[in-house]
């Protein structure tokens, strides 16, 4: 039975479109757009601290597939088999079936990315701070795909921004039987989209206006996003692995929040600054501090301008 609402967010009429014989899912398309935009943003931020853009291309070539596979493996491990049946041997690669766990994706992508940066002899901490806000933008765009898949919704609600979920999607999500009678639910994916963009803006501002030792921005990303997920896990009702009566990801989020805060404090108190000759921290305007100090003024470089 629908909750008494005068307004709500309607269910998506479609979840994809055809390009000739190929059916393109909006879910996958949003991930592609998010990844592409994240690479673009990171490239600009990496170049601003004096990094070689070609290194980012190499890192993305390795880290993006690793992140997708890591996210898929994490999803398969932490999602009950009544929702995700046991796959064939290629299950962890079957991203076309949907289902990616952010924690597994970040861990796998970060591990492979750090390996590639270290292999190139660059400072992975600077790369980490360059990519942190971009990750949040990519996650926000990916959440649009969750809307088209009618997933990642929360408890039933009578709020005017309640999301209408079709019966088929309700059945497929494994929500409690008592909630099947409702049709409008908390759009938790939308809450995360808004939070991700807000946190990305905060990280960019901090990087430009505060002396944050790298990888302090990445540590704040871990702490901030994990703290948000503590809230989200309390309103999500889709099927999930549980521990001590609570969703498993609730505990993962608690650990992530504590670890991120501890990491940030440690880095700011005892972390090393970039080595001499390495790119310095970015300043407003998209150049490094060293470059900004060395760049002559317009009047000095062009006497006619004075």
Task: Give residue ranges: language-model regions.
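A feature for loop-to-transmembrane-helix boundaries and adjacent hydrophobic helices
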Residues: 1-306
